[in-house]
C-alpha cells in the first residue's frame, strides 16, 4: 500500500484530505502528519488490508511510526518487519525525473528505461504523457533533503524495538 497512491486516490476522488494534501505534494513537501495519518488509517480499514499488508512510504518520521503502532494495536495486528531500501540520490533523481504519467489511463513510462514507441504518447491508450510536478528534479531534491532530516531517525526508532529491521541496497531494482 503506497502512500503516494493513497494521496492520488484522495485527490482524484476530491476528498477533503486530498485537497489538503495537494499543495504540499506539488511543492515536493511531505504532507502534514495529521493528513497522512488519517489517510493511512482510512486505507488500512479497507477489507484488502484485513489479513496484512506491506506499506510503501509510511511511516516517514517517528510521529507517524508511533501512530502506525496505535493503528496496528487497534487492529490487533503485529508489525512483522521493517525494510529500508537504500539507493544513491543521483540514481533516485534519474529514475523519478525520467518517469512520465499518462493523462488518459494513468499508466507510466520512462524516458530512458521504458521508452514509449512514440515520444510523449502512451503505448497503452495513446494518451498524452506528462511529467508529474513531484517528479521534477528540484522537487525530488527537496524530498531527499526532507528524507534525510525526518525519515532517517525512524531507523533508530525501529532498531530500539523488537522488530526485524532489514536494510537492502536497491540500486539494481
For each feature predicted by the language model, list its residue ranges.
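Residue-level preference for the first positions of well-ordered beta-strands
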Residues: 51-52, 163-165
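S-adenosyl-L-methionine-dependent methyltransferase catalytic core, i.e., the SAM/SAH-binding region
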Residues: 100, 152, 162-163
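ATP-dependent small-molecule kinase phosphotransfer cores
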Residues: 1-77, 88-91, 101, 132
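A glycine- and Lys/Arg-enriched "phosphate-lid" helix/loop adjacent to the NTP-binding pocket
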Residues: 23-24, 73-149
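Hydrophobic/aromatic beta-strand patches that form the interior of the parallel beta-sheet core
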Residues: 1, 81-83, 165
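Major-groove DNA-recognition helix of helix-turn-helix-type DNA-binding domains
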Residues: 158
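Conserved small/polar residues in nucleotide/adenosyl-binding loops
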Residues: 166-173
Amino acid at each position: 500500500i503506497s502512500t503516494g497512491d493513497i494521496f492520488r486516490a484522495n485527490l482524484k476522488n476530491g476528498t477533503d484530505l486530498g485537497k489538503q494534501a495537494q499543495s504540499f505534494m506539488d511543492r515536493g513537501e511531505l504532507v502534514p502528519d495529521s493528513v497522512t495519518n488519517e489517510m493511512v488509517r482510512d486505507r488500512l480499514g479497507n477489507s484488502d488490508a484485513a489479513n496484512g499488508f506491506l506499506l510503501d512510504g509510511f511511516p516517514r518520521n517517528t510521529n507517524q511510526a508511533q501512530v502506525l503502532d496505535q493503528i496496528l494495536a487497534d487492529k490487533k495486528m503485529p508489525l512483522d518487519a521493517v525494510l529500508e531500501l537504500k539507493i544513491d540520490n543521483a540514481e533516485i533523481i534519474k529514475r523519478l525525473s525520467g518517469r512520465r504519467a499518462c493523462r488518459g489511463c494513468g499508466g507510466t513510462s520512462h524516458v530512458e528505461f521504458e521508452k514509449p514507441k512514440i515520444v510523449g504518447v502512451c503505448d497503452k491508450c495513446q494518451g498524452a504523457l506528462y511529467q508529474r510536478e513531484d517528479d521534477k528534479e528540484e522537487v525530488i531534491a527537496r524530498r531527499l533533503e526532507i528524507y534525510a532530516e525526518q525519515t532517517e531517525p525512524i531507523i533508530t526508532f525501529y532498531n530500539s524495538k523488537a522488530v526485524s529491521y532489514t536494510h537492502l541496497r536497491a540500486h539494481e531494482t
